Regions:
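A short linear hydrophobic-aromatic micro-motif
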Residues: 121-122, 158-162, 228-231
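Extreme N-terminal starter segment of soluble prokaryotic enzymes
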Residues: 2-10
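Protein kinase-like catalytic core scaffold
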Residues: 121, 181, 229, 242-245
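Conserved anion/nucleotide-ligand pocket segment
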Residues: 121-147, 151
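Phosphate-binding site of ATP-dependent enzymes
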Residues: 139-224
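A long amphipathic alpha-helix within ATP-dependent nucleotide-binding catalytic cores
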Residues: 194-243, 255, 262-275
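Conserved N-proximal alpha/beta basic substrate-recognition cap immediately N-terminal to
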Residues: 12-114, 129
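A short beta-strand motif that forms the metal-chelation/ATP-contact edge
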Residues: 60-64, 124, 173-175, 239-254
Length: 276
């Protein structure tokens, strides 16, 4: 097998990277640069758009992929069955879809909000990650929730989840397997994908059990099968935390350099294990 067929990167389609196309592209390229050095490759690792990959899948031993489309995931499933290593795997991406994720979290008792709450309720698209601001809607009361559900139905979105709004600090975390974990308060630096983070206001930095949060994130990553992952949690004024989101391969924008090294290390370790 030629060097070009050793490893291929699959870029996420822009529709799955709302307001984050450049950041998603940056982390994928950073990982490719790390892998190129670690594998002593003379040529750059090819980067293919996921839609092109689904139509004409190139052959490789390893696919480093941020793809989310069903067509691309079906292709990755076939590649896995043929013996290739895919990170993230198709299974890991699918298990991060909100309907499946919510069932998984509830079954394994991962801390999460109730379905509705007195301080409002979030309605979230359940069949895929948010592709636009309208895929996640805050509803101040039950009547607003019913109207929002009707709005989803009119858009052809029939799978959704609801989550009680929890007052407290919003914490955004990033992880790679069990080797890497970082968390940040997004309101501290002001970056927001859709602006929803501002509803909780400035972080008060309530004390909480950071080790427990990390262990629950690791556990959820293993339950879903996502190698590179991230998510959001709310920490209330009593120090209790609740997971409100969990995603396959985020942009890692707040810790890109560290994350790229961790992802590359994880890929290399899993690759060598697969060769045994």
């Amino acid at each position: 097998m030629s060097e070009q067929e050793e490893i291929i990167a699959v870029r996420r389609a822009p529709r799955f990277s709302p307001n984050s196309v450049d950041r998603d592209d940056a982390i994928l390229r950073a990982v490719c640069e790390e892998l190129q050095q670690r594998m002593s490759l003379t040529a750059n690792i090819p980067v293919i758009d996921e839609d092109d990959f689904a139509k004409a899948p190139a052959k490789a031993k390893v696919y480093v992929t941020m793809a989310r489309s069903e067509a691309a995931l079906q292709t990755l499933t076939r590649k896995t069955e043929e013996g290739a290593l895919c990170i993230n795997s198709a299974m890991g991406v699918r298990q991060c879809q909100r309907v499946l994720l919510t069932e998984l979290m509830r079954y394994y008792h991962i801390p999460m909000p109730a379905e509705e709450g007195k301080n409002g309720t979030w309605l979230k698209r359940g069949d895929a990650a948010a592709q636009s601001k309208g895929d996640v809607v805050f509803c101040p009361d039950h009547e607003a929730l019913l109207k929002a559900i009707i709005g989803f139905t009119k858009r052809g979105i029939n799978e959704y989840v609801t989550s009680a709004h929890v007052e407290g600090d919003l914490v955004k975390f990033y992880g790679v397997g069990r080797r890497f974990f970082r968390y940040y308060y997004p309101t501290d630096d002001g970056f927001s994908k859709f602006g929803d983070e501002q509803r909780n206001g400035a972080a008060r930095h309530y004390p909480f059990d950071e080790d427990a949060l990390r262990k629950d994130a690791f556990r959820l990553a293993e339950l879903t099968g996502a190698t590179a992952y991230g998510g959001d949690a709310i920490v209330d004024d009593r120090g209790q935390y609740f997971f409100i989101d969990f995603n396959d391969w985020p942009s890692f924008s707040r810790c890109r350099g560290e994350a790229a090294k961790a992802i590359a290390a994880e890929v290399m370790e899993l690759y060598h294990e697969a060769l045994k």
